[in-house]
Amino acid sequence: MGTPRLPDKRWSIDLEKKIQEEHYADKSAYQNRYGFKPESGKELFVIDTPPPYPSGTWHIGAVAQYSMIDVLARSQRLLGKEVYFPWGVDRNGINIEFTVEKNTKRKMKTYDREEFLDLCRETIEAFTQAMRKTAARVGLSCDFAAEYLTDAPDYRAVTQAIFVELFKKGDIVEDLRPNIYDPVE
């Protein structure tokens, strides 16, 4: 019987940090392991999920959800498939505006437009960095090198082009329908 590689079975945060640092230290090895290589000739397995929205600290429910998705990605890699598991962040929405208002204790209407947008950008960037760090610390095997942000000009151009194409085909319609909404500002 072989000797255990970790004779001391107690876990420490320092040991965890060391393992994580080694895991991410060689960027080319990480990219080779988890990066998407469509020209590999392997059967493709594409994971398409709505990207998480950073409106604060990434909570345990979101971490659990992405951990389950990660299990699928890893299992498909073990089955020999080329897995596309992109890392993206949804950086559009009203929640960040509410967060800025809450943090500054000022309503959006009291700001100059550019000043408020700058505060929103700073806040969303801080939350994005924290979420990216948490995702890496959890050990998600997504393709961080191919990160996409929904407020990036290239991302917006693609989504707008798709919207225009669908509109021209008649797949987008205007209609009156009942909807649930929150009347509180």
Question: Where do the language-model regions lie?
Answer:
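N-terminal, positively charged nucleic-acid-binding surface of large information/translation enzymes
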Residues: 1-185
